[in-house]
From Swiss-Prot:
UniProt EC number: 7.1.1.-
Protein's organism: Stenotrophomonas maltophilia (strain K279a)
Assembly and binders: NDH-1 is composed of 14 different subunits. Subunits NuoB, C, D, E, F, and G constitute the peripheral sector of the complex.
Name of the top EC class for this enzyme: translocase
Family designation: Belongs to the complex I 30 kDa subunit family.
Cysteine pairings via disulfide bonds: none
Cited PROSITE patterns: COMPLEX1_30K
Protein name, entry field: NADH-quinone oxidoreductase subunit C
GO molecular-function terms, A-Z: NADH dehydrogenase (ubiquinone) activity; NADH:ubiquinone reductase (non-electrogenic) activity; quinone binding
Function (record text): NDH-1 shuttles electrons from NADH, via FMN and iron-sulfur (Fe-S) centers, to quinones in the respiratory chain. The immediate electron acceptor for the enzyme in this species is believed to be ubiquinone. Couples the redox reaction to proton translocation (for every two electrons transferred, four hydrogen ions are translocated across the cytoplasmic membrane), and thus conserves the redox energy in a proton gradient.
HAMAP family named in the record: NDH1_NuoC
Any Pfam family: Complex1_30kDa
GO cellular component, one term: plasma membrane
Length: 249
């Protein structure tokens, strides 16, 4: 613990303008920096702190973060139906945003995250036996761009391609930034929260044309089987506390 505390102090001193986040009880350390300092910070972590390996890199879409689809703390005849009707972005079709109430054709919610897209790199130092996360948010939601880290850790080449393919994050300076998982001509980025769960097109083999063709989705019903919930929701904790008090009486 003393070694980790020293490491956190050194991070805070070296990157004075950054945010150091420690998640308890596991003690996971995340250094959050502005996108403009993303590349320089990564280089310093490799050369000055001994993080010689980048284990992973991924994109994150924080659209709708902190919002759920479950309206009740207790089991009811209406709670689940409200959940499965789909209140979150992208549950039904492209570009549809729900209201605070039920329905998928309402207005865009008023409370949107100030920064939507983030990139997170997981770093490892073998010489110091340390692991940490480096995170930055893309400043422009419409066109998320951050610097490529392939010049520092070449092994991130395909990880950045994956984040580009699934989230649409552009890595400036990447030597070969093209899709890696989706098909040729794929429209959109499927891990974005506003991408429809049923997709935009479906694939089938056309017997007459003797080839695979794409058609608009028709065979999948847009239904949410598992509503989105928040772990340790305050409403749930309050309900449990009230039940515990009633049991004591």
């Amino acid at each position: 613990m003393a070694e980790q505390a020293s490491f956190i102090d050194r991070l805070s001193a070296r990157f004075a303008g950054a945010k150091v986040i420690v998640v308890e009880p596991r003690g996971e350390v995340t250094l959050e920096v502005p996108a403009a300092e993303w590349h320089a910070t990564a280089l310093a972590l490799r050369d000055e702190f001994g993080f010689e390996q980048a284990v992973d890199l991924c994109g994150v879409d924080y659209l709708g973060y902190g919002s759920d689809e479950w309206d009740t703390a207790d089991v009811s005849s209406q709670g689940f139906s409200r959940g499965v009707e789909g209140k979150a972005q992208g549950r039904f079709a492209w570009g549809e945003f729900p209201t605070e109430e039920n329905g998928a054709d309402g207005a865009r919610p008023q409370h949107m995250p100030t920064q939507r897209f983030a990139v997170v790199a997981q770093l490892r130092s073998y010489q110091h036996n340390l692991m940490m996360h480096l995170r930055c948010f893309a400043p422009d939601e419409a066109l998320p761009v951050v610097s490529s880290l392939t010049g520092i850790w070449p092994g991130l080449n395909w990880f950045e391609r994956e984040a580009f393919d699934l989230y649409g994050v552009i890595f400036e300076g990447h030597p070969d930034l093209r899709r890696i998982l989706t098909d040729y001509g794929f429209v959109g980025h499927p891990f974005r929260k506003d991408f429809p769960l049923i997709g935009n097109v479906e694939v089938r083999y056309d017997e007459e044309k003797k080839r695979v063709i794409y058609e608009p989705v028709t065979s999948v019903e847009p239904r949410v089987g598992v509503p989105r919930v928040i772990r340790d929701d305050a409403r749930l904790q309050t309900a449990e506390g009230e039940r515990a008090q009633e049991a004591v009486k």
